[in-house]
């Protein structure tokens, strides 16, 4: 059964490594050393719920509900455009230190709300956990399925805590004005690219619904 664990771990790691909204947010909180371990835990717990739902049967709901998929997609597009705009505005600020200080004033609950939006309004999360993991893990018998899910969840916990701790450790180098400008530009551009990609997928979904 251990082979199913490592299969799940490898697949989970492959899906979570690319830079996306979750990773960017965890990295930024680590650099600020602002509730970064709490955010890593909440991201990992969110993945636990989504992965479990996808592997143990939730994928059927998304696949059979094209309107739900469209709603999630366009909600994600709107959020990613807003999130990317915020990062680019911070990067282009004439007083980056003041802009960063304003971000640091955010309270715990606002940070948690942003994390939940970054996670649950990202359609790629549902495609990864419900469609990809659901189609692969859902075909297994119950015992291998549990090991497969455990491996995938382990990859998520290891990655988010590792990213948060590494970003906090590198904070003295990454918290400079130049580094912050580069990071925010990178995050903003990536968020907009993902948003435009999702918008194209959303248009295709809407076209399929009305034809």
Curated annotation (Swiss-Prot):
Spans through the membrane: 1-21, 37-57, 68-88, 111-131, 147-167, 179-199
Keyword Nucleus: no
GO cellular component: plasma membrane
Coiled coil: none
One Gene Ontology molecular-function label: L-arginine transmembrane transporter activity
Catalytic activity: L-arginine(in) = L-arginine(out)
Predominant location category: membrane
UniProt entry keywords in alphabetical sequence: Amino-acid transport, Cell inner membrane, Cell membrane, Membrane, Transmembrane, Transmembrane helix, Transport
Subcellular location, record wording: Cell inner membrane
InterPro entries listed in its UniProt record: Arg_export_ArgO_enterobac (IPR023445), LeuE-type (IPR001123), Lys/arg_exporter (IPR004777)
Membrane topology: Multi-pass membrane protein
Family named by the database record: Belongs to the LysE/ArgO transporter (TC 2.A.75) family.
Job of this protein: Involved in the export of arginine. Important to control the intracellular level of arginine and the correct balance between arginine and lysine.
Protein name according to UniProt: Arginine exporter protein ArgO
């Amino acid at each position: 059964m251990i082979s199913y664990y490592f299969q799940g771990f490898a697949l989970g790691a492959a899906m979570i490594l690319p830079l996306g909204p979750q990773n960017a947010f965890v990295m930024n909180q680590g650099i600020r050393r602002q509730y970064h371990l709490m955010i890593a835990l909440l991201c990992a717990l969110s993945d636990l719920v989504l992965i479990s739902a996808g592997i143990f049967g939730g994928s059927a709901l998304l696949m059979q509900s094209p309107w739900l998929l469209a709603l999630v997609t366009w909600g994600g597009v709107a959020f990613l455009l807003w999130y990317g705009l915020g990062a680019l505005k911070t990067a282009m600020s004439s007083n980056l230190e003041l802009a960063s200080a304003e971000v640091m004033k955010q309270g715990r609950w606002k940070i948690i709300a942003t994390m939940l939006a970054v996670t649950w309004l990202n359609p790629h999360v549902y495609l990864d956990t419900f469609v990809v993991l659901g189609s692969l893990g859902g075909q297994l018998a119950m015992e291998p399925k549990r090991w497969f899910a455990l491996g995938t969840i382990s990859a998520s916990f290891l990655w988010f805590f590792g990213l948060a701790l590494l970003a906090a450790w590198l904070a003295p180098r990454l918290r400079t004005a130049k580094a912050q400008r580069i990071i925010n530009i990178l995050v903003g551009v990536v968020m907009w690219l993902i948003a435009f990609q999702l918008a194209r997928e959303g248009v295709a979904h809407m076209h399929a619904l009305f034809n």
